[in-house]
């Protein structure tokens, strides 16, 4: 794959829970090294779409590819068949995901949390995994917390560990699902700074966020979703300063008060 091709391609993606259709034909492209921010009210389908990208949720129809490969499926003729769990897990090593609520292992130290997946999933030797983990923890400003346990950290520190843990797998794509929504306001800035540094390093990212100022600063493209559809998509300037759709205008007028 060339460096200019899309990392993520979603084509007419549908997803329902029972009779509730959550995604109603999402079509999006994310180019390599692009940062896309997904905005929208609660229940608009943003987080569901993000979880579909790495097959934490199964799509009902459409296509979702990361670096040209169907995530969680293989095509046989005109049919998509779900892969075995082992192959899905292998695919997910290319995709890092950071959730709202950290999801660190409470019985492991910070260092142990970061080296667990590289050792267990990728088979990296412990010494090499530790060396890389220490560098990552330095990058997120936690080199002094290596032997601490999650319950000894603030929420912001735990989220920065979660980012380092995801990066330890050397992903090609990072997904962030409202990474600051569970944090006290004074802790948000440090986490956003880490994500900004990732963007500056060229990491391809999709970020679900309610931080409008952050989206304006970091995003190459902004997508406004509502009721399971893409309402409007464009540059931060286009969407945040001059939205064309009344639904986008109404949403921004509320959150920017």
Where are these regions (language model features)?
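Conserved ABC transporter NBD signature motif
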Residues: 62-76
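Short coil-to-helix segment of the ABC ATPase nucleotide-binding domain corresponding to the Q-loop/switch region
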Residues: 108-116
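A short, proline-enriched helix->beta-strand linker immediately N-terminal to the Walker B motif
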Residues: 168-172
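Catalytic Walker B motif of ABC-type/P-loop ATPase nucleotide-binding domains
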Residues: 174-177
């Amino acid at each position: 794959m060339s460096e200019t091709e899309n990392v993520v391609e979603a084509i007419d993606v549908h997803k329902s829970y029972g009779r509730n259709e959550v995604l109603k034909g999402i079509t999006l492209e994310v180019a390599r090294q692009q940062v896309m921010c997904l905005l929208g009210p609660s229940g608009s389908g943003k987080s569901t779409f993000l979880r579909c990208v790495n097959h934490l949720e199964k799509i009902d129809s459409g296509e979702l590819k990361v670096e040209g490969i169907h995530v969680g499926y293989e095509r046989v003729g005109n049919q998509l068949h779900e892969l075995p769990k082992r192959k899905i897990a292998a695919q997910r090593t290319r995709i890092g995901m950071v959730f709202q609520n950290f999801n660190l292992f409470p019985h492991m130290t910070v260092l142990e949390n970061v080296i667990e997946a590289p050792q267990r999933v990728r088979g990296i030797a412990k010494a090499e995994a530790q060396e890389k983990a220490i560098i990552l923890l330095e990058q997120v400003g936690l080199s002094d917390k290596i032997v601490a346990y999650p319950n000894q950290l603030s929420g912001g520190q735990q989220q920065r560990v979660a980012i380092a843990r995801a990066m330890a797998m050397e992903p090609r794509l990072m997904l962030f699902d409202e990474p600051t929504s569970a944090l006290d306001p004074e802790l948000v800035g440090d986490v956003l700074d880490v994500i900004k540094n990732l963007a500056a390093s060229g990491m391809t990212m999709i970020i679900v966020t309610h931080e409008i100022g952050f989206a304006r600063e970091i995003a190459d493209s902004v997508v406004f979703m509502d009721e399971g559809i893409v309402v409007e998509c464009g540059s931060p300037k286009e969407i945040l300063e001059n939205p064309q759709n009344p639904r986008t205008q109404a949403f921004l007028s509320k959150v920017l008060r």
